[in-house]
UniProtKB/Swiss-Prot annotation:
InterPro entries (alphabetical): GIY-YIG_endonuc, GIY-YIG_endonuc_sf, GIY-YIG_UvrC_Cho, Hlx-hairpin-Hlx_DNA-bd_motif, RuvA_2-like, UVR_dom, UVR_dom_sf, UvrABC_protein_C
Any single Gene Ontology cellular-component annotation: cytoplasm
Limits of the GIY-YIG domain: 37-115
Keywords: Cytoplasm, DNA damage, DNA excision, DNA repair, Excision nuclease, SOS response
Boundaries of every UVR domain copy: 232-267
Protein name: UvrABC system protein C
Family: Belongs to the UvrC family.
Source organism phylogeny: Bacteria, Pseudomonadati, Pseudomonadota, Betaproteobacteria, Burkholderiales
Keyword Cytoplasm recorded: yes
Family annotation (CDD domains): GIY-YIG_UvrC_Cho (cd10434)
Annotated SUPFAM superfamilies: C-terminal UvrC-binding domain of UvrB (SSF46600), GIY-YIG endonuclease (SSF82771), RuvA domain 2-like (SSF47781)
């Protein structure tokens, strides 16, 4: 970490903008002065080593120097520049390389002042199994299934699809039109009669020989052609086969094909793909309002509209102001004619295109609601090997698709703003109800603990985190509770609080003595919720007194009369009287939301642990000489299988009916 002089602060001073340039470490200014006039990517770091901003430049020296050659005042860019203490750069060969590297780094480093589209789950695919095997008859009859993950060459994958629902709709279509199987191979290989799907005309029952391998292969081929967009050809082939069977007076087979043709015709009509020339297209519509943005991605694959998916970027206001104030200057300086500054919509859309298609196949055509930089499309083509065209202001069917995407973007953004407004109101109500002194409601951090077990078995504690007006799933933690009397919730609460805050409390004490806070140190929450009444709060108070932490942070959620929802009361560790907020209180709604999430998280973890313990518990009875009675005595003596596993052979031999030799056998079996 760079050393700051005593006269400097990592934060910009409050108040009016100074007349002089903000001070920066000499090493930083020296690094800036020594930059080459070459294309590249730069990263700014603050005092704690966190990445502030990632940018690209045609001329690194000119671009980076512009940040430090003038006073930016109290703007967002000024606030960011005041925090910069270190710089890193990477020289590249071209602007296209700079674009790709910049957005790779943005996704990897999560800088505070860049437009950031956070990674979501990978896209789902429709999987069709392949690679016939003589040892597995099922592979001669491929199955269709939902799939998410790494692909294997021996199978075929169609997609990606925007959602799991879209894949399941496609699978249902494969069943209705082509009667393809969906059962797992072990089920397929061991069936002796058709399943219900055969009865309702959604499977041809290849498992029991109701269709030949050749006919099933024909259905598979038609399904593949349909998924690739050759719907018309599939329809013509089915009609030709139907007429051929009719001419041979094979009316039952002709009727089956007639039903397939009717089902396929209905699908094509519903999805409006009768005369669509586009095979694979992504439609991107952006809506910006209230400092937030939504990019709605609609996907057309094989000429079929598969649905859409909304994305909500972070840091829109900060990033666009910095781009407009500084990031775009270079484009003006390095061009003979000054182009107009891109709109916020264009900046958001370009950020999405650059980040989204790093890990997702890009189709040859993008239909966009705002213009996209040609250099960005060239960079995508270099990365993917596919020539990419962006169509702005489309016509005919493309225009219909774009209008649908724009409508959905507006609806999704309105929903988000409404939800955020409601959640912010709840946060404010909680802060006011508990007299929490906060300058920034966004910074309110609540951690909630819950204990879960079944009759003392598989005890786990959960900790969930609420911050920035929403639950922070990535910060959830589970704690396995050991070495306590089974069922002792108070001891479990004591253990989890010590483990959660013990090291942090020690670090804070050392920082008070040295006057320096180590980099990367976490912070105490503004509120610690425990699911329980006075007993749990008393235990939490003992732990905080032992650690020297502020007792006013602790609040217990005590169930009301009859344990009815809405009658909960808040119990305080610092001696304040209990508070009843009222069943319609926004503050209580937030407390209940956090408490219920902690309970859900604890329950799911406890059930998984209990299932594992019970499966492992079968090992005891597998040991020669251990029957139900001796197993029961062992579990009763040591509190569970884990306790038996942790015990030594000498301890195990103290159990009635367990000899020294058997104890050693048990010890070996469990280790």
């Amino acid at each position: 970490m760079p050393h700051l002089p005593d006269s400097m602060s990592p934060e910009a001073p409050a108040g009016p903008a100074p007349a002089t340039l903000p001070a920066h470490p000499a090493q930083l200014l020296s690094d800036v002065a020594g930059l080459p006039p070459l294309p590249g990517v730069y990263r700014y770091f603050d005092f704690d080593g966190a990445v502030l901003y990632v940018g690209k430049a045609i001329n690194l020296k000119k671009r980076v120097s512009s940040y430090f050659q003038k006073n930016h005042g109290g703007t967002r860019i000024g606030h960011m520049v005041s925090k910069i203490v270190r710089l890193e750069t990477t020289v590249v060969r071209s602007e296209a390389e700079a674009l790709l590297l910049e957005n790779n780094l943005i996704k990897t480093l999560n800088p505070k002042y860049n437009i950031l589209f956070r990674d979501d789950k990978s896209y789902p695919y429709l999987k069709m199994t392949g690679a016939s095997s003589s040892s597995n008859p099922g592979t001669s009859f491929p199955r269709v299934s939902y799939y998410r993950g790494a692909v294997e060459k021996k199978h075929q994958y169609f997609g990606p699809y925007p959602s799991a629902w879209a894949v399941k709709e496609a699978i249902l279509l494969m069943q209705k039109v082509f009667h393809l199987r969906t059962c797992e191979d072990p089920v397929f290989n061991n069936r002796t009669r058709p399943c219900l799907l055969y009865q309702i005309k959604r499977c041809s029952a290849p498992c029991v020989g109701h269709i030949s391998a050749a006919d099933y292969a024909q259905d598979v081929a038609n399904a593949e052609r349909f998924l690739r967009g050759d719907a018309r050809q599939v329809m013509e082939a089915l009609e030709a086969r139907m007429m051929a069977h009719a001419e041979k007076l094979e009316f039952e087979q002709a009727a089956e094909l007639r039903n397939q043709v009717a089902a396929l015709s209905n699908v094509l009509h519903q999805q409006s793909v009768d005369n669509v020339a586009d095979r694979d297209v992504d439609i991107l519509a952006v809506k910006v309002q209230g400092g937030r943005a939504c990019v709605n991605l609609a996907m057309v694959r094989g000429g079929r509209h598969l649905g859409d998916r909304p994305y909500f970027p972070a840091h829109v206001e900060d990033a666009t102001e910095i781009y407009n104030a500084g990031g775009f200057e270079e484009a003006v300086e390095d061009s003979t004619t000054a182009p107009p500054v891109p709109s916020v919509e264009t900046q958001v859309l370009e950020a999405f295109v650059a980040q989204h298609y790093l890990n997702v196949p890009v189709p040859p055509t993008l239909i966009v609601s705002a213009p996209v930089n040609k250099q960005l499309l060239e960079a995508l083509a270099i990365q993917s090997g596919v020539k990419v065209t962006a169509v702005h202001q489309p016509r005919e069917q493309r225009r219909v698709w774009l209008e649908m995407a724009q409508t959905n973007a507006g609806l999704q953004l309105a929903r988000l703003l409404s939800e955020e407004g409601s959640q912010q109101a709840r946060t404010r109500a909680l802060a006011e109800a508990l007299d929490l002194a906060l300058d920034d409601l966004d910074a309110l951090r609540v951690e909630c603990f819950d204990i879960s077990h079944t009759a003392g078995e598989a005890t786990q504690a959960s900790c969930v985190v609420f911050a920035h007006h929403k639950m922070q799933n990535a910060e959830y933690r589970r704690y396995n509770i050991n070495d306590i009397t089974p069922g002792d919730d108070y001891a479990a609460m004591r253990q989890v609080l010590l483990r959660r805050y013990g090291k942090l409390a020690e670090t804070l004490r050392e920082a008070q003595q040295t006057g320096q806070m180590p980099a990367g140190t976490g912070r105490l929450p503004d509120l610690v919720l425990v699911d329980g009444g006075r007993g749990q709060v008393s235990m939490a108070r003992e732990v905080f007194e032992q650690l020297g932490l502020d007792l006013s942070l602790i609040v217990g959620v005590e169930k009301g009369e009859g344990r009815k929802v809405g009658l909960e009361e808040l119990v305080f560790a610092d001696g304040r009287e209990k508070v009843y907020l009222g069943k319609d209180s926004a503050a209580l709604m937030l407390v209940a939301q956090i408490r219920d999430e902690a309970h859900r998280f604890a329950i799911t973890g406890m059930r998984a642990k209990r299932a594992k313990v019970r499966v492992d518990g079968g090992k005891l009875e597998e040991i020669p000489g251990i029957g139900p009675k001796r197993r029961s005595k062992l579990l009763q003596r040591f509190g569970g299988v884990r306790g038996v596993a942790l015990a030594g052979a000498e301890d195990i031999a103290t159990v009635a009916g367990i000899s020294r030799e058997l104890a050693e056998e048990i010890y070996r079996a469990l280790h």
